């Protein structure tokens, strides 16, 4: 059997409504930000090619609705994910307090093969509003440390601060899972048609 590394990684972005999940994805994929807010209905995704360890892979980034009425749809979107990104708003303490429930929901509905070692990344968004900060960076770092040393970045979807670096680490975290999930393809089998003239007749009953 020959093995081939994965070329596509599924990234799930979770967090309360209004924390900027769609804006983060749009800034990373399209380098664009809009002030207009439109709540995501159900889920949506964008794709971007990125270089990881000298090879090109595609990140399929899923932006999911933060409203409770859509959370029952989570299982269908979460399964098969290679990394989960938890987002909160540094000016909104409630969105930070929700990180535990979002993490637990993903583990319950996404059912990753190895829950204890599944990669999460936490993003504290709206760093451009640092003067209105309500969640201290040290508090977020402590939360991440207590949940298995989760990677953490403070970012801004508006001015792109730390966006590229954060998603590069997200991509690497997703790729780290493929050691246990390599895709195997059988080696090529060549079929040779036998010349009928060279076939020997065999007696016997049907």
From Swiss-Prot:
Listed PANTHER family: RAB FAMILY (PTHR47981), RAS-RELATED PROTEIN RAB-7A (PTHR47981:SF20)
InterPro entries: P-loop_NTPase, Small_GTP-bd, Small_GTPase
Protein name in the entry: Ras-related protein Rab-7b
Residues with the Phosphothreonine modification: 34, 40, 64
Phosphoserine found at: 17, 23, 72
GO MF, one example: GTP binding
GO CC annotation: cytoplasm; microtubule; oral apparatus
Induction annotation: Expression increases by 55% during phagocytosis (at protein level).
Post-translational modification comment from the UniProt entry: Glycosylated.
Species for this entry: Paramecium octaurelia
Residues that, per the record, bind GTP: 15-22, 34-40, 63-67, 125-128, 157-158
Compartment list: Cytoplasm, Cytoskeleton
Keywords: Cytoplasm, Cytoskeleton, Glycoprotein, GTP-binding, Lipoprotein, Nucleotide-binding, Phosphoprotein, Prenylation
Lineage, broadest ranks: Eukaryota, Sar, Alveolata, Ciliophora, Intramacronucleata
Motif (Effector region): 37-45
CDD domains assigned: Rab7 (cd01862)
Lipidation (S-geranylgeranyl cysteine): 205-206
Family note: Belongs to the small GTPase superfamily. Rab family.
Modified residues (Phosphotyrosine): 78, 88
């Amino acid at each position: 059997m020959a093995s081939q590394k994965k070329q596509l990684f599924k990234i799930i972005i979770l967090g309360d409504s209004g924390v900027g999940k769609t804006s983060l994805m749009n800034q990373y994929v399209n380098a664009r930000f809009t002030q207009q807010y439109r709540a995501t209905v159900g889920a949506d995704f964008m794709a971007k090619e990125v270089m990881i360890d000298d090879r090109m892979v595609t990140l399929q980034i899923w932006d999911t609705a933060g409203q409770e009425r859509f959370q029952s749809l989570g299982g269908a979107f979460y399964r098969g994910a290679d990394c989960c990104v938890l987002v909160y708003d540094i000016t909104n303490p409630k969105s930070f307090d929700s990180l535990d429930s979002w993490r637990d929901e993903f583990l319950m509905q996404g059912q990753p093969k190895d829950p204890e070692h599944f990669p999460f990344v936490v993003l504290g968004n709206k760093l451009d509003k640092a003067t209105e900060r309500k969640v201290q960076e040290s508090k977020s770092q402590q939360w991440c440390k207590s949940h298995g040393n989760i990677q953490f970045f403070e970012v801004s979807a508006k001015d792109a601060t730390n966006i590229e670096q954060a998603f590069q680490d997200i991509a690497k975290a997703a790729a780290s899972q493929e050691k246990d999930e390599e895709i195997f393809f059988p080696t090529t089998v060549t079929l040779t048609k036998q010349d009928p003239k060279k076939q020997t007749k065999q007696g016997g009953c049907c």
